[in-house]
From Swiss-Prot:
Pathway: Lipid metabolism; fatty acid beta-oxidation
Gene Ontology MF term list: acetyl-CoA C-acyltransferase activity
UniProt keyword list: Acyltransferase, Cytoplasm, Fatty acid metabolism, Lipid degradation, Lipid metabolism, Transferase
Full protein name: 3-ketoacyl-CoA thiolase
Biological role stated in the UniProt entry: Catalyzes the final step of fatty acid oxidation in which acetyl-CoA is released and the CoA ester of a fatty acid two carbons shorter is formed.
Classification via Pfam families: Thiolase_C, Thiolase_N
Catalytic activity: an acyl-CoA + acetyl-CoA = a 3-oxoacyl-CoA + CoA
Assembly, per entry: Heterotetramer of two alpha chains (FadJ) and two beta chains (FadI).
Length: 436
């Protein structure tokens, strides 16, 4: 066991997570169509503060993230402060770590708490795949800049004459890695082939995710952590996530064609997480500040770790790299965990990480560790389903996982929970949570 790194303030306070909330998650182009991420962020933070009954002036910092950023609101965190009635003097800044963005936001607020610069803060993230920054071609962009500087109409017309019809076509946001040109699904296909993960295994995991998420909603387990969203024109509220397929069968999954490697692939739209709109946030405080306010924490942040690997091959192995580091810093092993919640970007990615967490060879030859991190106990793993079912608004997923895991730990009488995710750029994130 390596060095344990206690997450405490200078006064010995633990980092308490006192509350968490999210919007329902909606598939791209459905319930939240036309609602930008900044409005989703305002929606969830405003409701979180109202439900917690914590005076707005108590919150000293807000760290929020957005992956698909809109040019008109580059600092989503500050816009949320200004749009929710929070104290205008509240420190607010934005972060981005791809699919681990709200993990980063939580870590940043925790670090401010440990440094003693604040005693309470909000962390979270929001993304919209329905309101996108549709751009223009590089040639058109250059001409528009030059036209703005031109002094005469003839100069402007001469500049516009350089353009062709193809230069006027809108340019959608990139879906591939900037460094490699690979799409996430291409990497998932790599991983399926590298680790021998079959189409049947992927479909089975996806089906499990949807069944468990549907059961969680049916049992009322999510009602305290998901707000009702009232969407213009306010005729019909969104109460639950609208991606979950509770009545599907394995035979339904088998009907879909591969989405990335059309000829030999196994990754489909059904065994991948969909493009999604939504927002989520958590309130963090020092343990003593929570006691002063008479608040009972949902739980505590025990440790966290971020890692990075090469992006050319199997880059979605973040959980296999970050989990052993987070456990080491918490002074725990896999067997100490009550729950394990892993982000399901793709079923192939999830199954590959599970495989490597239990691999002695991977531990020795790749991580340089003496032993495997540990086998993943299926009875502890994604017990309420995962991102394949709920959806994945990139910057919101981490906060969803944290809140969901802490509530489930309480239902089980407390214990330790691991939340972990892969992210674009070969990044990984893991956090160990504790509930009493």
């Amino acid at each position: 066991m390596g060095q344990v790194l206690p997450l405490v303030t200078r006064q010995g306070d633990r980092i308490a997570i006192v509350s968490g909330l999210r919007t329902p998650f909606a598939r791209q182009g459905t319930a939240f169509h036309g609602i930008p991420a900044v409005d989703l962020g305002k929606m969830v933070v405003g409701e979180l503060l109202a439900r917690s009954e914590i005076p707005a002036e108590v919150i000293e910092q807000l760290v929020f993230g957005q992956v698909v950023q809109m040019p008109e609101a580059p600092n989503i965190a500050r816009e949320i402060v200004l749009g929710t009635g929070m104290n205008v003097h509240t420190d607010a800044y934005s972060v981005s770590r791809a699919c681990a963005t709200s993990f980063q936001a939580v870590a940043n607020v925790a670090e401010s708490l440990m440094a003693g610069t604040i005693r309470a803060g909000i962390a979270g993230g929001a993304d919209s795949s329905s309101v996108l920054p549709i751009g223009v071609s590089k040639k058109l962009a250059r001409v528009l800049v030059d036209v703005n500087k031109a002094r005469t109409m003839s100069q402007r017309l001469k500049l516009f004459s350089r353009l062709r019809l193809r230069d006027l076509m809108p340019v959608p946001p990139a879906v591939a890695e900037y460094s490699t040109g690979l799409r996430m699904g291409d990497t998932a296909e790599q991983m399926a082939k590298t680790y021998g993960i079959t189409r049947e295994q992927q479909d089975a995991l996806a089906h499990r995710s949807h069944q468990r998420a549907a059961q969680a909603w049916s049992d009322g387990k999510l009602k305290e952590e998901v707000m009702t969203a009232f969407i213009p024109p306010y005729k019909q509220p969104l109460v639950e996530d609208n991606n979950i397929r509770g009545n599907s069968s394995l035979a339904d999954y088998a009907k879909l064609r591969p989405a990335f490697d059309r000829k030999h692939g196994t990754v489909t739209a059904a065994n991948s997480t969909p493009l999604t709109d939504g927002a989520a946030a958590v309130i963090l405080m020092t343990e003593s500040r929570a006691k002063e306010l008479g608040l009972v924490p949902l739980g505590y942040l025990r440790s966290y770790a971020f890692t990075a690997i090469d992006v050319w091959q199997d880059m979605l192995l973040g959980p296999a790299w970050s989990t052993p580091l987070a456990l080491e810093r918490a002074g725990l092993t896999m067997s100490d965990l009550t729950l394990i919640d892993m982000h399901e970007a793709f079923a192939a990615q999830t199954l590959a990480n599970i495989q490597l967490l239990g691999s002695e060879r991977f531990a020795r030859e790749v991580l340089g560790r003496a032993h495997a991190t540990g086998e993943v106990d299926d009875s502890k793993f994604n017990v309420l389903g995962g991102s394949i079912a709920y959806g994945h608004p990139f910057a919101a997923t981490g906060a969803r996982m944290i809140t969901q895991t802490l509530h489930e730990l309480h239902r089980r009488g407390g214990g330790f929970g691991l939340v972990t995710a892969c992210a674009a750029g070969g990044l990984g994130a893991a956090m160990v949570l504790e509930a009493e």
